[in-house]
Amino acid sequence: MTGLPFRIGYGEDAHRLAPGLPLVLGGVAIPHAELGAVAHSDGDAVLHAVADALLSGLALGDIGQYFPDTAAEWKGMDSRRILAKALELVEERGYRPVNVALVVTLDRPKLGPLRADIAASVAELLGLPAGEVGVSFKTSEGLALEHVQTRVTVLLGRVDD
């Protein structure tokens, strides 16, 4: 295998929120959410950002290239499929995720009680120990009450043959 032993990827995603829609973050349904993501897929901003981080680490573009929001076939799609495709592309090139750090900005509901669930879900989807997925939560301090945003950094390691 050739190439750098490590690569760093960065991903970001945001969705407007509206009443009557589910809110899913990191593959976890968020209970008691009054607002949910407005999106072509299920609107999981965490998994979208993780997928983009995986792709950017190897200069493979972004999820919009693989799952355009103009294609009817992706309407309502479970974002775990998006992440699985990004992971497949990374693994095909001889890399795997080593560590993930993610920050979710959301004013309400408070997500602290779900930190371990979100970390465990993302870790499982990536084949990592839960301790390799760091999850932080922030608020917008009232600046943007009706949106969710996620920023993610991923460390990719080359898999030696």
From Swiss-Prot:
The keyword Mitochondrion does not apply. 4-CDP-2-C-methyl-D-erythritol 2-phosphate binds at residues 13-15, 40-41, 62-64. It catalyses: 4-CDP-2-C-methyl-D-erythritol 2-phosphate = 2-C-methyl-D-erythritol 2,4-cyclic diphosphate + CMP. Keywords: Isoprene biosynthesis, Lyase, Metal-binding. SUPFAM superfamilies: IpsF-like. Binds 1 divalent metal cation per subunit. Involved in the biosynthesis of isopentenyl diphosphate (IPP) and dimethylallyl diphosphate (DMAPP), two major building blocks of isoprenoid compounds. Catalyzes the conversion of 4-diphosphocytidyl-2-C-methyl-D-erythritol 2-phosphate (CDP-ME2P) to 2-C-methyl-D-erythritol 2,4-cyclodiphosphate (ME-CPP) with a corresponding release of cytidine 5-monophosphate (CMP). This is 2-C-methyl-D-erythritol 2,4-cyclodiphosphate synthase. Its EC number is 4.6.1.12. GO terms for molecular function: 2-C-methyl-D-erythritol 2,4-cyclodiphosphate synthase activity; metal ion binding. Pfam families: YgbB (PF02542). Its cofactor is a divalent metal cation. InterPro entries: MECDP_synthase, MECDP_synthase_CS, MECDP_synthase_sf. Pathway: Isoprenoid biosynthesis; isopentenyl diphosphate biosynthesis via DXP pathway; isopentenyl diphosphate from 1-deoxy-D-xylulose 5-phosphate: step 4/6. The keyword Transmembrane helix does not apply. It is an enzyme of class 4 (lyase). One of its GO terms (biological process) is isopentenyl diphosphate biosynthetic process, methylerythritol 4-phosphate pathway. Disulfide bonds: none annotated.
